[in-house]
Regions:
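Vicinal oxygen chelate
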Residues: 2-12, 42-46, 65-135
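Short catalytic micro-motifs in class I SAM-dependent methyltransferases
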Residues: 5, 24, 127
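Core segments of cupin and vicinal oxygen chelate
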Residues: 9-52
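Short, flexible helix/strand-to-coil boundary loops that buttress conserved ligand/catalytic motifs
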Residues: 20, 56-58, 92
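A short, acidic/glycine-rich surface segment
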Residues: 29-30, 39, 59-66, 135
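Conserved segment of winged-helix/HTH DNA-binding domains
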Residues: 50-56, 60-62
C-alpha cells in the first residue's frame, strides 16, 4: 500500500501552486474547478511519485493554530527528500534568499537525518531532508 496524496486548503491557490512548482519541482495538472461548490484545486506530482492536492473553496475557515511557534495534534509537516546534505543547504539558502523563514537547521537530527524546516506561503511546515553522512 502507498500513500496516494496529501491535501492542503489555501486561500491563495495560484501562489501556493507556484511555490511548490518553483521550489520543489512540482508538476501541476490542469486546474479543476467546480463552480457550484466554488471549489478549485490543483494536483501536483513530484519526482518520487508522491502527489499534493492544493485546494481553495469559499467558506473554508482559516486555520487558527499557531503553526510557527507551537506544535499541535494532527499532521504537522510535509518533508521533501533530497540526495545530499549539500542539496539541503542549497535549498535552505534558496528559500531564505526568496524571503521564506527558516525555522530550524540545517542540522543533524538525533535519528540520523540532516534537515531544515521552513514554511510555505500558507505557513504550513515543510522539511527538506536527507540521511546524515560524516564528512
Amino acid at each position: 500500500m502507498s500513500l496516494e496524496h496529501g491535501a492542503i486548503w489555501t486561500e491563495q491557490l495560484e501562489v501556493s501552486k507556484n511555490f511548490y512548482v518553483k521550489f520543489f519541482d512540482g508538476v501541476p495538472k490542469e486546474k479543476y474547478t467546480n463552480e457550484k461548490k466554488q471549489f478549485q484545486s490543483y494536483f501536483l506530482s513530484f519526482q518520487s511519485g508522491a502527489r499534493l492536492e492544493l485546494m481553495q473553496m469559499v467558506g473554508v475557515p482559516a486555520n487558527t493554530n499557531d503553526r510557527v511557534v507551537a506544535q499541535h495534534q494532527g499532521i504537522i509537516h510535509l518533508a521533501f527528500g533530497v540526495d545530499t546534505m549539500d542539496q539541503v543547504d542549497e535549498k535552505a539558502k534558496q528559500l531564505a534568499n526568496a524571503g521564506f523563514l527558516i525555522l530550524s537547521g540545517p542540522r543533524k537530527t538525533g535519528d540520523g537525518y540532516y534537515e531544515f524546516e521552513t514554511l510555505d506561503p500558507d505557513n504550513n511546515r515543510l522539511g527538506v531532508t536527507t540521511f546524515f553522512k560524516e564528512s
